[in-house]
Amino acid sequence: MSKLTNKHKQKNKNKRNKTRKKLHRLKEVDNFYYFVNKDWFSKNVISKTSNVKNAFSILQDKVDKELHLVLTNHIFKEKSPEAKHCKNIYDSVLTFNNELTEKQIYLFTEEINNYRKMECEDGLYKFLAWAKLNGISSPISLHMINDNEHHGRYILSLGEGGLSFSLKETYTDPKKKRLIKAYTQFIKETFAIIFGPNNTYCAEDVIDIERELSKKIYTQEENGDLNKTNMKCTSSQIKHRCDFDFYKFITLFGIKINKNSYKTNVENPEYIKHTSKLMLKEWTTNKWNSFWVFRLLVFASGFHSELNKYFFSFFSLRLNGILQMRPRCDYALSFVANIMNSTISRKYIQYYKNAKQKVFVTELTNKIKCVFKERITRSKWLTDKTKELALRKVDSMSCAIGYRDKYIAEPSCDFSATDAISNFIQFVKWDNEYVIKHLHKKMPDKTYWLRTNEGNVFDVNAYYNRSINEMIIPNAILQEPYVCLDKNMAYNLASIGFIIAHEIIHGFDKLGCQFDGDGEMHNWWSKEDSDNYKKLQEEIIEQYETVSKRDNIKLNGDLTLSENIADTSALQIVEDVLEDYLVERDIFGAEQDKHFKELYYNYATQWRTLMTISRMKILTALDGHSLTNYRVNCTLIRSERFRRIFNIEPKDGMYYNKPMSVIW
C-alpha cells in the first residue's frame, strides 16, 4: 500500500474534526443515532487488529479470552483423547512450520500435474473430487444444506466458487482497474514466495480465468432470491441442463445415489453450465494450471508465515482497513474451535454457563411471541386464512436458547503438534465422511446443538434458521450488555428483547415468509396477501433509500429488505411488550413516556458502531444489513410513539413525509 503524505494525513484529520463538530451540533430530532452516541464516538477508536468496534465485537473479545482460559486452564490439563487433540491442534498453529507446509504444497502441485496428464473428462472430475476432499476451493463448490422441501433432512448443493471477489463488477468496472492491477501484482508475488521469482506461473492468467468465471455469478440480490438459488435437479437433469456430470463426480466420494430420482440443489445453473464448459475445454492448459496452483496457495496461506503476512497485507489491510494482525494464539484458538467444536462448546458451557439469563430470556421470548401473535391477529392487511397459518408458524417455531445437552461426535483423527496443514487436511476428509454418512439420514433431533444450524454457543450473535423454523440465541450473548438482570425492562427490551423479536420476524421476512411452520418451502399465502406484502416491502425499500440519500449514501433497499423488515417490526413488537409491562404496573402518561425514552436511548446505544471506511464500502455493497445509523434512525422514524414523544416535525431530520404502514 502507498503511504499517505503528511499533507494528506492532515487533510483527512481536518475532515474528521469538521465532521465531529458537525455531529456534536446535532439534536435528537435531527439524527437520533448520532445524538445519543456522539460522546462515545469521540472517546473510542477501532483496534488496529480490527475494522469495527461495537457492542458485539467488544463482547466477542471478552468471550474469546474466556475460551483461551478454557483451553489453557482446563482442557490442556486433562488426559482425555479430546484434550490431546486440542493441545496438538493448538500447538501446530501457534508456530508456523514453513518447511512442512512447503512440502505439502509441492506434493499437491505434483498431484495437480498428475491429474492434468489424464487429459480427459474423467480426469477433471477426479481432480475436482480430490480438491474437495483436501479442502482446496475450485470453481464449482459442493456442500451439504438443510433440504428446504423435505423437513429434517440434508441435501447436497452445487454452487459458485474459486473467486477472490464476490462482485462481478470488481472484474469489469473501469473504476476497479487499480484494484485489479494491485491484485495481479499480489498474485505474482504470492507465486514468487513459494516458487521463486523465475517461476512459470502467470498472474494474468489467474485474473483472466476469474474474470471469465465471474460473468455468470449471481449479484447479491440474486443470491437472496430463492427462485434462483433453490433449483432441485436429478443427476441426469444436471448433466442435461448444466453440462456437468454430477453423477460421475459424486460417485468419486463414495456416495451412492439414483441418477434419475435423487435430487441435488443447484444454486446457479447458468454458472455451473458456463464453468463446466470452460473447464472441460481448458482445464489441463498451462493457463488453468496457474489458476489451480494459486487456489492451492490460497488454501495454504494460513499455514505459512510469509504467505500469511502477504495475504493479510492485501485482503485485510488493503481491502478491509485492518492495520495489524491478531496474535497467533487467536488463530490457534479459532482453529481448535473449528475442529474440536463439541469439546470447546461443552467446556465453555461448563465454566461460563449463563443459566439465570437463559431462564430470563426464555420467559421473555414467550412474552414476545405472545405479543407478536396478538399483532398478527390485529393485522389489517392479512386475510383470516393467512393469519391462521402465520399464527401456526409462530407456535411451531422452536427456540435454541443458550445451549443444549448434546453435541455431535468429534473427529477421530491423529492430529500432530507440529503440522497444522496436515491436521486441517485430516479434518476436511473427516468432515466429508461426515457428510457422506449423514446425507441420506434425518437430521439429529433438537436435543443436539448443531453448529451447522445454530452457530456456536460461544458466538456473540443470534440466528434464525428458516429451513427448520428455529430461532437461536447462543450462550455468549446472554450477558451484559445484552442481558442485564439488575436493569429494568426498558433496557433489556432494547437489547436482547429487540434481538429476539428481530430473529422471530425473520420467519416472516422476504425469504422467511416462503417457508411454513415445519420449515418446508412452499407458498402458504393467498394471492391478495402476497400482493399486499409486496406493496409494503416497496414502501420499506423506498424509505431506507430515501433517508440514506440525505447523507449521500447509496443504500440498496432490496438487498437489505429482509433485515429492514426484521428491524422495523421488532422495535414495534418490543414497544408493545413494554407497554403491556408498564400497564400491568399501573404506569401511564408522562411516567410511561420516560420508560419509552429509555427504550429508544438504549436501542440507539446498543447499535453504536465505529468502522473503517473500507468496511463501510464492503457492507454497503455486500451485506444484507443496513449500516447501523439507518438500522436505528429508519426504524425509529417508523415508530408513531417515538415521533410523538420527541415531537418530530417536518423540518426535522427524523421526519419522513410518506406513508409508513405497519407490517408485522
Q: Regions from the language model: what does each represent?
A:
Residues 1-20:
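Arg/Lys-rich, intrinsically disordered low-complexity tails that mediate electrostatic binding
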Residues 60, 206, 212, 235-244, ...:
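Intrinsically disordered, low-complexity linker/terminal regions across diverse proteins
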Residues 22-42, 170-192, 561, 571-573:
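Hydrophobic/aromatic-rich, well-ordered segments within soluble, folded domains that form packed cores
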Residues 22-24, 141-146, 460-464:
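Short, surface-exposed beta-strand/loop micro-motifs that present aromatic residues
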Residues 66-367, 404, 430-431:
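Noncatalytic, helix-rich "gating/capping" subdomain that lines the substrate-entry/channel surface
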Residues 31, 141-142, 153-155, 461, ...:
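Beta-sheet entry/capping signal
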